[in-house]
A protein has these predicted regions:
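Short, exposed beta-strand-loop hairpins at the edges of beta-sheets
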Residues: 102-105, 112-125
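Short, loop-centered acidic/histidine patches that primarily coordinate divalent metals
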Residues: 92-95, 118
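Sec-dependent N-terminal signal peptides
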Residues: 2-12
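Central antiparallel beta-sheet cores of small beta-barrel/beta-sandwich binding domains
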Residues: 19, 25-27, 31-93, 100-101
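N-terminal helix-cap/turn-to-beta initiation motif at the start of protein domains
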Residues: 10-21, 123
Length: 132
């Protein structure tokens, strides 16, 4: 019965369950997720990693004309639509590699967020923590 209750709670969770500030799995940045019209999106709100080798611009972008844009404010989650308990149909940009992946966002009962990126059928997930 608790599994059914958990599924019902997750399915009925409003978009506010994912909107807000999230600490990335590597603890290098905070991403702010919010509404972008009819979709959900997220941008880098703050860089936490420090040091001379930590880039402050999008240096790994495959488009050389975009490599000088700052990471703070950079859209990294784009075009997610509600699909039951998940947000799907979006893309996640990885500034560390310059690659963009098909992605989905899944709020967890413990208050964390699972961000899953896929290429074809190969997927990798990260667990992000809400910043209060």
């Amino acid at each position: 019965m608790s599994v059914v209750l958990a599924a019902l709670l997750a399915a009925s969770a409003p978009s506010a369950a994912v909107e807000g500030d999230w600490l990335t799995a590597d603890r290098a940045a905070i991403v702010r997720i919010g509404s972008c019209g009819a979709h959900l999106c997220g941008a880098v709100a703050r860089i936490l990693a420090r040091g001379p080798k930590v880039p402050r611009t999008d240096v790994h972008n495959p488009d050389p004309t975009l490599r000088s844009r700052p990471l703070v404010g950079l859209p990294v989650l784009i075009g997610f639509a509600r699909d039951g308990a998940q947000w799907t149909g979006g893309r996640a940009y990885d500034a560390k590699t310059g690659r963009t992946y098909k992605a989905r966002l899944t709020p967890n009962l413990d208050g964390s967020l699972t961000v899953t990126g896929c290429i074809l059928f190969l997927c990798k997930s990260q667990r992000w923590t809400r910043v209060h």
